[in-house]
């Protein structure tokens, strides 16, 4: 594999050499041949010696044989050479293996040597002990000898004493006893010494055993470490696979978005064309009305003329002909059903003007032939006007009619309307059918689909009459056209006195023309005014039209809702019936709409735009019809056809009203498709109400007035309607989230949860939506069409089916819940009810506002959840994906149900919302347990990290706390804990969501009262923390919706107090470098406090929900900063209060974060996770981002001082940010629970909470860093350098000549590449370390060395792999220059790829990311936004904004990185660097971008770093896998080629994390990472971002991976050069 390029190059060279030799030989032979031929000629001339020729032939044959032999020898030599080359390659491989083995053996020898040295040391110590004991024994022996000598001396002295010469030897016994005594003493001493020696020997043996056990334990630890690393590698591979799936879905979503955008553009163009056509149609219809009047006059004149002619001629044949021709017009009325028949019917009267005798009045008087007045007589009149018969071509009537009518009655526009309408109606009809296929079928209102025929097959006049459904006569003309179409046939015969009749007719037509012209002038004046008004009002009307329609719909819905509420309240059991009846009425109305739409098919696309016009036209049409009625009555009284024509305008008025209503219905159906697939209930309500209000001329006026008033009120009360919209939005989003994790729950529970979260999120989003309302209302069409099209198309169909299903379940639920909810909700409805009513008045507002954000979240959340869940664990992922798929549908159903419920009435919604609150509390308990289970499982999967263990401990403690807390609070705490667990795992996610809900604000306030909660073990610290946090965030004006401004002290004052307290305990607890041990204690203490304070705060549902969220955050942020577990607990409680959905969301996120927590790469991943969750909840993003930002800030400070630096700085710095009243971060405001008018205060509070969250995030990240191993940055740098050197050496050794160096250089640093050229996800540790750690940890300065070691090993392995992949690399190398993301091109592709993501403005539904729409803007703004916190896209998950900004940032940073191609993004973020980075005024975004780049490898630096490594060197490979696939990721991918997962991660992270980072950075930046760089308030983001460079001056160190930034071509050159070398 490795030698492929070398062999190929050598073969080419050999072939060239052989070719040259061959050519030279040929040339020589040719020259020789010439010489020989000349010689031959001479010889032949001399003599024909045949023997010489034979000799020459023989010699030539010999030479040829010799040549062949030489060639064979040469081929054999070449084969031998090739074999030798192969052997050489094998030898080189074996050498590599031997070198690796030698290295391993050297390491083993070093370990053994160290063990031997340890043994020697132990032996020396023991020998010294033995020597000491021997010396002591010797001393004792000496002393004993001396003592014995002394005793012997004494004994010797005794006999010397003069003894009685004769006395017996008395002293002998004494001497013996003394000797015996001394011997015993000596033996005892000896035994004692021997015992001591034996004891010392045993102790020495035990010490040796202990040493052996320690050595064995070390070996086992190493084996276990290897196993764990392998596990982590597998998990990282799974994560990479999941991320690839996510990226694929992102790409699909982007493509779908592009398709929808194209469709929207096409619809816009069609709309403009239809607008112009509408004006023409209106003119045509008005002129047709005038023609009808004039024709009615003609009818009378015809009668008189025919009667006079008949009487004058007195010819029975003529009379019989006339009578025969008309005897059964009614029989023929139904004849022309086909377009041909109609045209024939329309032409026949034209051909036989004399055949209109007396029977005609009867037909005119009948309602059926009323349309004959329109078309039949319009066409019959043409000959009278032209005074010449017109040939029977189907097209003839219209030009003749046009010419004559223009001459006498009609303005020039009539010709245009009729003549031009021929062509227009059919395509329009086709378009209308395409747009509204369901409504094409004929309905019960219209006989036998005649109206459809009218629209499809009628003559141009018919189309002219049909095309403008907006004109007064339209529906009546059409309705009667099908029936009376056959009556045209009755004029087959011509009278004999045709010429005389023509003369009379012309005279009378002149008279009638005058009358008609006067009428037409009046009508035209009115209609001109109408047109002007329509045109003038088109722009505002288009905006107001949807609102007015929504208002009309909701006025009708109000009645329906009032009725439905009455029925529900009175007869809960009857509610399903009424709903079913409503559905039936809706179905029948939809059928009718379909039938009407058939007629209106031409106008239908127009109706979208015409809705605004319909209202003014409705008013003016009614006025015009009234005036026409009066004039018609006056004119017709004098004419025989008075009654007929009089009836006609009356019916026309009614029909016009009905047609207008039907148009509105069809428009609402279109709106359903465009804005809310769920509008169908509204449309159905409209349709049901409109048959009731067929005489809506006045209602239409009132509707318009109400529309205006509603629009004004909407503008005034955007926040209020948004509240309901927000309720709906998050009710839908949350059920999606809850359903993702708990799809098995019944739809009823989901609906209840949805309603509950609606109340919460109504308050939260009311703020942000209040601000965004105007933005959304301004371009509702743009914003709605793009996100709604895809979402609506996806959702609308199942929703229609599911709406019915949901209506059934909702009926049952509503019956049960209405009673309890009514009482509960009446209070909340006082404020929310009005807003809901107003919101219901403007369903448009709901649809646009809801759809961009909710549907984004609804659609995005499943993706985000899938992103998070895949990270949780593959098992959880699989289950979660299944649940996501199942429950996305269910959530769509819940959305449908939601719309229906919302449409029903705000009361029901509120009732159900409270009902949901109750059920959710119950569910929260179950969910908490489930989340604990999942968390425990995840914890088991992640046993490596102490965080996991602490987390499990915390979970258990949370459970205990939940049990301790009152039952009502227990549910909340369970949910909270579950969510906190989830959030802890999602650590930042939970925080995000807590901030997101703005419940942090409420909870900060509520939490403070909970500080004193008796059960809280650490009430003081928590109080301090809570006070600090609540004072930080909450004191800034956060007050619970209930007005729970429970902030303990002045915001400014308590913040400092709370901070010092929080910081001190944190510092104390965190004094442990890891902060893990101390933190568990803090967690334990804080957990009960959190659980209980959360529980205490919870009692008030508003407070519980809002307040707990904050306390959870505050305590989480404060107490949990030391321990991640505490964060999870607090997050759990807070999020439990926030809702089980958050639990679910955070469960996914927690799974991801939690799994990432153990991994050293977790910090890098947290930002992605944050990004994802941020995408899930824009505001929550802010929260998470705050965490990651500060987490990064934390990590930004050296790991050794994790808490003092991170948490203290985070907390201390956060308060100023929190205190900054300027926070305008609307997503957070959106999250703010309750009405909370103090948007800024709540924002600040949420910021404070976020700041806490950030501090906690920092704490977590630092803990993670510490847990993962706090590696000084210096070692990282050294490790990276050594890695680079080793990689270079290995590359030099292992690189086959043919392989481009770029790949190899990249390979060691770059994470593994799969043979497919995809990055091989290294084990999690490696992924985090390689992809993230070298750059990320280097930036973190914590984990780089392990990652370096792993990367070094991986680099070696990768060298082998790279050699295996060399062919692929070469292919990639050849392809790479063409790949969009090839490193040489990386900077451009990066800018380009983000554009794709940036393009969909649908992602940024607030349009905040509009700046990212352009690639350049996306790149520039992406950098700025990332630097600035991406406020433009801050709330956006949108790949456009966040991805664009991240990509832009990554591309910009990459641009910076790429600019310094050699930058090995193993930027050792020393404290100094971090200080520089943090010191840079960068906003939280910068901090996140850098911090995330630092600790998190925050997908920007780590991605840019590791990715740039990949881009620069591996870029060619990565680009195929990552750049192309993950356009966004590709941007980031090129950094150091370190992030194999970085591509996937960067893509997800870039897609999700980039979004997350951008958003987390947006928010997180917005979350002032003050700790990082005095970043000031989140809004200093922009200022700081402007100040900061993407790298904030962090020194970039060349990494191994970045040695060669090859465009593949360079790599190719290198490979060639190496091959030639």
From Swiss-Prot:
According to the UniProt entry, which residue ranges have a biased composition of type Basic and acidic residues? 687-725, 736-770, 779-788, 904-936, 949-960, 980-994, 1012-1024, 1129-1145, 1159-1184
Looking at the record, which segments are called Coil 2A?
Answer: 174-192
- Where is region (Head) located? 1-7
Q: Where is this cross-link: Glycyl lysine isopeptide (Lys-Gly) (interchain with G-Cter in SUMO2)?
A: 811
IF rod domain: residues covered: 8-313
Q: Where is the composition biased (Low complexity)?
A: 1085-1098, 1440-1453, 1460-1470
Q: Which residues carry this modification: N-acetylmethionine?
A: 1
Matching entries from SUPFAM superfamilies are given as: Intermediate filament protein, coiled coil region (SSF64593)
According to the record, the residues making up region (Tail) are: 314-1621
PROSITE patterns tied to this protein: IF_ROD_1, IF_ROD_2
Q: Segment Coil 1B: which positions?
A: 56-151
Question: Residues annotated as region Disordered?
Answer: 439-490, 670-788, 895-1593
Linker 1: region residues: 44-55
Stated family: Belongs to the intermediate filament family.
Q: Which PANTHER family match?
A: NESTIN
Give the protein's function. Answer: Required for brain and eye development. Promotes the disassembly of phosphorylated vimentin intermediate filaments (IF) during mitosis and may play a role in the trafficking and distribution of IF proteins and other cellular factors to daughter cells during progenitor cell division. Required for survival, renewal and mitogen-stimulated proliferation of neural progenitor cells.
Name the record gives this protein: Nestin
What organism, scientifically named, is this protein from? Answer: Homo sapiens (Human)
